[in-house]
Regions:
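C-terminal luminal/periplasmic domains and tails of membrane-associated envelope-modifying transferases
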Residues: 172-182, 186-417
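Polytopic membrane enzymes that build or remodel cell-surface glycoconjugates and lipids
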Residues: 1-225, 240, 247, 261, ...
């Protein structure tokens, strides 16, 4: 197509990578040996390109032997010709960095690959004088190939499900208009497994490509929403599967500013083998000091105006703390859950908004909605949620209705399962 007059110029971008590109498609030709090659690479650190080339040489020798023995030259050469015709345009036109993340291009040569391996399996089976034994060997070889395909598809499906869950959460979060503009933090755009079924094929799933953004994803699914994504590494956990996140990387000051210009803040987290998107709160700036008495007053620096708790659809407790700040506070927030016997059964300490807006960064007039989550609790009900602030000198005084709280831990809400 590129050579047709008036259509476009032909760019041979892949010529500089022709060795790697050819080896990539040779890997496709010998793909049933891919799991074995990958195991050798992982266990002994051999070079995958070299192993693919060695495997191709072995397959070629076996193929020639079987073709000579069975007089199948026409079918063998037809399969190889189809493979070459399907692979050659990509070999000369695309860089290796593109091929490596695009195993779908192997489908261009798939008819030739299947033809070659059908002849190889049939040829090996025909070496046995016992017809039933030959059929059993043929079925075993074909079944091994199908099994490796199933493993590959299973891993791809696992990656897709892991990302699909968090994107379903995203669409649910974006559905109500009152949530926008939305701030989405650490949203994984792509997921790749560090383990490989086939040596030279990267197993990955991409939900938002580099040329798009979270707002466009929402728009094509439910309609336009004002949404923006960012990356904040201090609350980004490392996982076995490597993922890329949407948005620009921000520091502490940047993430606070990012939160203040959006109505709701949502944080993507990895928890118990899955990614989830949680609403973690909001920050309003330059608000007036409330005239009503605070639920909890921590010596004038910060106060809790209200607190509530309810069960989320996923079974976790969703604890909401509404703070008002008179200025930055030298300290950290603790949130403890105690049972009827005053035993500690859970804690969700740390900065507000999922760990992104610490109390020492609060400014006068900030109204912070701090949403935290905790799973199932064990112990005697009811459970009490206690909140306090501490620093190197100890806990800050906590006052409720003019009375200082025992241990400076204010019981703000009760949980009953």
């Amino acid at each position: 197509r590129s050579c047709l007059p008036g259509i476009g110029g032909m760019r041979l971008t892949g010529l500089k990578d022709w060795v790697q590109n050819t080896t990539f498609f040779v890997h496709g030709l010998v793909y049933p040996l891919g799991p074995l090659i990958g195991e050798i690479v992982e266990r002994w650190g051999w070079q995958d390109l070299t192993l693919v080339q060695m495997s191709a040489a072995v397959v070629l020798v076996v193929g020639v032997f079987l073709a000579v023995r069975g007089r199948e030259w026409r079918w063998v050469t037809a399969g190889l010709w189809w493979w070459l015709c399907g692979a050659l345009p990509s070999i000369v036109a695309l860089p290796f960095s593109y091929l490596y993340i695009s195993p779908r291009l192997l489908m261009l040569a798939s008819v030739g690959i299947v033809t070659v391996w059908a002849l190889l399996v049939d040829g090996v089976a025909s070496l046995f004088q016992d017809v039933r034994l030959g059929r059993a060997v043929g079925l075993f070889l074909a079944g091994s190939i199908v099994l490796s395909n199933g493993v590959f598809l299973g891993r791809q499906r696992g990656l897709f499900i892991a990302l699909n869950d968090v994107y379903q959460d995203l669409l649910l979060a974006a559905a109500p208009r009152e949530h926008e503009p939305l701030a989405i933090v650490n949203l994984p755009t792509a997921l790749a497994s560090q383990r490989k079924t086939y040596a030279m094929i990267l197993e990955n799933v991409i939900f938002i490509p580099w040329y798009s953004n979270v707002s466009e994803f929402i728009e094509v699914n439910i309609g336009y929403r004002d949404a923006e994504a960012a990356i904040f590494t201090p609350v980004r956990a490392e996982t076995e599967d490597v993922f890329g996140a949407a948005g620009e990387g921000l520091n502490w000051e940047g993430i606070r500013s990012f939160a203040t210009i959006h109505r709701t803040v949502w944080l993507a987290r990895y928890d118990a083998g899955r990614y989830r998107l949680d609403e973690v709160g909001s920050v309003l700036t330059a608000t007036q000091q409330p005239v009503n008495d605070a639920l909890v007053d921590f010596g004038g620096g910060a106060r809790i105006e209200a607190a509530a708790a309810l069960r989320s659809d996923d079974g976790r407790w969703r604890i909401v703390l509404d703070w008002w700040a008179a200025g930055p506070v030298d300290g950290e927030i603790f949130v403890h859950v105690r049972d009827r016997n005053d035993m500690l059964v859970g804690q969700i300490d740390g900065p507000a908004l999922g760990g992104m807006v610490p109390i020492w960064m609060w400014e006068r007039g900030d109204r912070i909605r701090d949403i935290r989550y905790i799973g199932d609790l064990e112990g005697d009900q009811p459970f009490r949620v206690q909140v306090g602030i501490y620093n190197e000198s100890g806990r800050l005084p906590a006052w409720m209705s003019g009375i200082r709280c025992p241990d400076d831990a204010a019981s703000v809400v009760v949980l009953e399962q």
